[in-house]
Amino acid sequence: MGSRSGEQGKRMAELSKNLKEGERILEPTRRPDGTLRKPIRIRPGYTPEDEVVKYQSKGSLMKKEMASQGPPGYEPDPAPKPKTKAAKRNERKKEKRLQATAEKANSSEDGSASNGSQSVNVLASEMEALDVSSNNDVCGGAPNPGTTGEDVEKRIRALKKKIRLTEAQQQKTASRDLNPEQLEKFSKLEEWRQELKALEDKAA
């Protein structure tokens, strides 16, 4: 064992004598079985295989570059500038406005909840607005002698619309869900039909 180490020392001394400029010697390393490897002379400019930079194509380099920059079209925000007094004032105004609109929205939601139960009454209110005939006409009284042909046509159109809306509402809603106002409209349906017939006869 001692002779081997002596031999290694001699070999190292010989190699170091013959070294050229920039060369170096890698000392002997021990194998797993306990024996020593030979000392290695390393020429100048040599880089070990595992330290050599691997070749990368242009595409892979571009991918890496793009990944570091973020998605296409992305521009990082520049450093934020200190806000002026006017900008701060404007921000406060915006916040107040947003709070006011949020409060209004909350109050309107509360109101809409109460209006939700009255959604069935919308058609009824439309029919009230279309009320054209007076009580005398409904009872079968003769229309005003001064009415022109255009007035009669308008009345006929209005009555047809009222009848159509009432019939549509009658089909949509069940009889048990009706409120008194709707029941009244349905009871007037036959009277409106009679009035319409009378007006159509008169127009003819």
Swiss-Prot record:
Mutation effect (L196A) = Accumulation in the nucleus
User: Its domain of life?
Assistant: Eukaryota
Tissue spec. comment: Expressed in root and shoot meristems, cotyledons, vascular tissues of leaves, receptacle of flowers and siliques, and pollen grains.
Ranges for the region named Disordered are: 1-121, 133-153
Q: Which Pfam families match?
A: Mago-bind
- What biological processes does GO assign it? exon-exon junction complex disassembly; mRNA transport; nuclear-transcribed mRNA catabolic process, nonsense-mediated decay; positive regulation of gene expression; regulation of translation
Query: What's the main place this protein lives?
Result: cytoplasm
Q: Where is the composition biased (Polar residues)?
A: 104-121
Keyword Cytoplasm present in the record's keywords: the answer is yes
Q: Which cysteines are joined by disulfide bonds?
A: none
Supply the PANTHER family for this chain.
PARTNER OF Y14 AND MAGO (PTHR22959:SF0), PYM PROTEIN (PTHR22959)
Official protein name in the record? Partner of Y14 and mago
Query: Which organism is the protein's source?
Result: Arabidopsis thaliana (Mouse-ear cress)
Q: What is the lineage of its organism?
A: Eukaryota, Viridiplantae, Streptophyta, Embryophyta, Tracheophyta
